[in-house]
Every structure is written in C-alpha cells, then in structure tokens.
Swiss-Prot record:
Record-linked InterPro entries: HGPRTase-like, PRibTrfase_dom, PRTase-like, Pur/Pyrimidine_PRTase
Family statement drawn from the similarity comment of this UniProt entry: Belongs to the purine/pyrimidine phosphoribosyltransferase family. Archaeal HPRT subfamily.
Protein name, entry field: Hypoxanthine/guanine phosphoribosyltransferase
GO CC terms: cytoplasm
Catalytic activity: IMP + diphosphate = hypoxanthine + 5-phospho-alpha-D-ribose 1-diphosphate; GMP + diphosphate = guanine + 5-phospho-alpha-D-ribose 1-diphosphate
GO biological process, one term: IMP salvage
A GO term, aspect molecular function: hypoxanthine phosphoribosyltransferase activity
Amino acid sequence: MKILERSLKTCPIVQRGEYTYFIHPISDGVPLIKPDLIREITTEIIKIGDLNVDKIITAEAMGIPLATAISLCTDIPYAIIRKREYKLDGEIAVHQETGYSKGELYLNGVNKGDKVIIVDDVLSTGGTIIALIEALRKAGAEIKDIICVIERGDGKKIVKEKTGHTVKTLMKIDVIDGKVVIL
C-alpha cells in the first residue's frame, strides 16, 4: 500500500470549524485520482475481501470509483446507496449521521437473500456504514464483508458496538499538527 501511504502523507489539510479535513483523491476526488492508486486499492480489496457475493454495495459519492473498479475486475455488479430519493418499488430509506452531515440515504437494487460486500472510501464516525447496514438488513440482504480504504477516528469500534459487524480497513490515519500520520 505504498502509493496510498505516500498520497496520504502529502495530501492537503484544511480546517472547517472544529473539524480538520484531509483532502485526498480517494475521499474527495481531488486533486486527481490516479489509476495506480485505484489499482493498488482495488487489488488489496480483492485480496482481503469476501467476494463470494451477489453484489457490491457502496455509498454515494466517493465509494463509486472503488465499486466500479472492483466490479470491473470481478464481474460482480454493484448498487449505490444514494442521497436522493427515486421512489422506485422496494426503495429503502435510512437516516445517516456523520461527523459533518445528516440526511436520508436511499437503497435500490438489493433483494432479500442477496449476499453483499460493502466498500467505501473513509470510515470515521461510522455513520455511513451504520446506515448502509440498516438499509441492507431491511432489504433482507446478507452482509458478508465490509471494507473501507481509510480509517480515521473511532468508527470501527462504533460500527462493531452498534451493529455487531467488523469493518476491515486498508490504512489507519490521524491528522496531527497539520499532517496526516499513518498509525
């Protein structure tokens, strides 16, 4: 994971109110998402993930490039939990709260009995993953695995406590003195 580590150590840091953000291609789509970074992450997720599944599930927006790359390499279709309602038959709405926002998320394209893997860009507070798990449980899906690329904060512990699910992550970080530190 040398490319991911190098890119994290050199990414810009911005302060918004009380929260310190790291700006990274995987979490923000800027400054530029390079193919070697996506390739490295995709290869690692395929290596460690339980891909004996019917569908890959991700959250809008930055989980989409990851799910797309994994889908192209594995021929497993993916569904996106969206921030917008489509009012399709069987659509499932769940409430999401993260460290910086709250709102509704909408799941379509998942059926009872589907085996799924969840992939996402960042795990910090656990709010997005908890909402995904809730939606998938309502749909009657079986969650086989959960993988997030970057871990920051206590989200892994919070998800385990609130849902019983373990989240795998590729790299744990913190922002200390205006820099990303790999833990």
